[in-house]
């Protein structure tokens, strides 16, 4: 035991010297400029990896299920949705993977994540069957959920410029997805069977950016400062702190959080609102099928729509941020949910009635920006601001679970319906899930959920929105 402690101390002493040297190294005055350029390109790769398979859903199902297996499109899409559930257990590994960056640093995982996103894109480019495709797609899905480029942006910016820098890079990344329709026009030439080639260019960008990050990005000062402080802390003191943290965390836990949430008005209605809201989540993943099979848009028309998709997405993402800062969380969720509802209705009707692909594209982009603007606010902010400190982490997990459960439920419903309804009706089916979900969320947020902006998170108890209990006891004398 003593030898193990000595080895640990010796290893940490070497690491401490290395970390202090890294922290003391001076950066040139242009470092942040080229770092943010690298991060923006990595973010573009991340955004493309997040959305490209959604945008090529029709092509993927047609090749792997309709042509290779001889299935009808609806049955093929249903099976494709079922196969997607296989990746769920792998995604759960993020719980163990993500904390590694707190021990080994941000830079190694910025490089690894970017490299693996590029590798996933490249595997899909090479895929000839659904099995190879799923390997590449699952690898992409796992890595995009880590968002190490976001951590870099936040930790390399000061408090005054943090929000601005993040907003700028995020907007650039969304607009960078214009690369996909550009590649559809040039390399793919709007030929459905050539969809694989579109994956090649962002894969190459991912590989190059991983190399650039390895050569030119430095470890963040925020991590180095925290790690050095940890290494300088005696082992016994660390053990005592860990014990105290475990005792504090023992007050939490998902079951305790669920029981607490259902006992208190604010969290109870936030959960109900989320159940409705996430029922509409399939609208974010099925617009390719709606355009190709329900609206019967050609590859050229879909490409034109996708040129306007990032514009609508970026515009409504910025609007969401402005509304949140100006008017608060509740108004943001209601306003952006209304916007998402209007945009999705416009998307479906614009496509089905052949108005113009440009309007169809900006409408679905507006839906995506509005929907996730509301979703990030309700899940990422309001759950946290409505929970006491000792349960906050556990309560936010409820939102993640609701997203998976309701999204999975909606997927199962469509898996049953897709093989038996005409392709022309797919758009109306997704509309039938999206509209009631958003309307329900809007009504519940408007009537039953309180505002949380401006609350001191250190003093929130979660009971602030509970109605005072009425004393119904009566004396024998009457009133």
Question: What do these predicted regions represent?
Answer:
Residues 1-55:
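Cytosolic juxtamembrane N-terminal segment immediately preceding the first transmembrane helix
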Residues 53-55, 264-317, 407-411:
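Extracytoplasmic gate region of multi-pass secondary transporters
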Residues 56-91, 300:
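Extracellular/periplasmic helix-loop-helix junction of adjacent transmembrane segments
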Residues 79-99, 307-320:
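Central cavity-lining transmembrane alpha-helices of secondary-active solute carriers
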Residues 92-128, 327-330:
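Conserved MFS/SLC helix-loop-helix module at the cytosolic interface between two early adjacent transmembrane helices
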Residues 115-128, 338-354:
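C-terminal ends and interior cores of transmembrane alpha-helices
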Residues 131-144, 357-374:
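Hydrophobic core of transmembrane alpha-helices in multi-pass small-molecule transporters
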Residues 144, 161-189, 205-206, 399-411:
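Glycine-rich segments within core transmembrane alpha-helices of 12-TM secondary carriers
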């Amino acid at each position: 035991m003593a030898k193990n402690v000595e080895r640990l101390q010796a290893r940490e002493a070497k690491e401490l010297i290395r970390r202090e040297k890294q922290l003391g190294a001076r950066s040139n005055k242009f470092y942040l400029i080229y770092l943010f350029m690298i991060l923006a390109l990595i973010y573009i790769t991340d955004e493309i990896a997040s959305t490209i398979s959604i945008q090529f859903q029709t092509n993927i199902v047609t090749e792997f299920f309709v042509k290779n297996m001889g299935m009808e499109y609806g049955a093929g899409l249903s099976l494709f949705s079922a196969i997607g559930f296989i990746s769920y257990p792998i995604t759960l590994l993020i719980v163990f993977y993500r904390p590694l960056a707190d021990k080994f640093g941000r830079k190694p995982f910025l490089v690894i994540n970017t490299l693996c996103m590029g590798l996933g894109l490249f595997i899909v480019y090479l895929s000839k069957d659904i099995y190879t495709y799923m390997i590449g797609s699952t690898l992409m899905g796992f890595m995009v959920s880590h968002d190490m480029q976001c951590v870099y942006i936040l930790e390399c910016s000061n408090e005054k410029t943090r929000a601005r820098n993040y907003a700028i890079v995020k907007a650039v990344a969304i607009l960078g997805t214009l690369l996909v329709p550009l590649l559809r026009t040039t390399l793919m030439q709007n030929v459905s069977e050539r969809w694989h080639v579109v994956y090649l260019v962002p894969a190459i960008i991912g590989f190059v950016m991983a190399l650039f990050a390895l050569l030119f990005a430095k470890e963040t000062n925020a991590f180095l400062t925290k790690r050095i402080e940890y290494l300088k802390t005696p082992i016994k003191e660390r053990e005592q702190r860990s014990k105290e943290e475990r005792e504090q965390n023992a007050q939490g836990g998902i079951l305790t959080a669920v029981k607490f949430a259902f006992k208190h008005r604010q969290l109870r209605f936030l959960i109900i609102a989320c159940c409705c809201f996430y029922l509409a989540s399939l609208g974010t993943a099925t617009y390719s099928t709606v355009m190709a099979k329900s609206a019967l848009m050609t590859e050229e028309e879909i490409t034109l729509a996708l040129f306007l998709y990032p514009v609508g997405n970026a515009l409504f993402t910025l609007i969401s941020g402005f509304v949140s800062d100006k008017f608060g969380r509740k108004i943001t969720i209601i306003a952006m949910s209304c916007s998402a509802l209007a945009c999705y209705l416009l998307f479906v009707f614009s496509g089905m009635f052949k108005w113009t692909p440009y309007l169809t594209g900006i409408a679905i982009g507006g839906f995506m920006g509005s929907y996730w603007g509301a979703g990030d606010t309700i899940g990422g902010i309001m759950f946290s601001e409505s929970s006491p400190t000792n349960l906050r982490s556990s309560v936010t997990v409820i939102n993640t679970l609701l997203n998976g459960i309701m999204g999975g439920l909606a997927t199962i419903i469509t898996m049953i319906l897709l093989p038996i309804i005409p392709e022309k009706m797919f758009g109306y089916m997704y509309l039938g899930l999206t509209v009631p979900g958003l309307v329900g969320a809007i009504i519940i947020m408007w009537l039953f959920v309180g505002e949380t902006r401006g609350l001191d998170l250190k003093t929130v108890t979660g009971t602030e929105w509970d109605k005072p209990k009425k004393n119904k006891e009566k004396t024998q004398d009457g009133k």
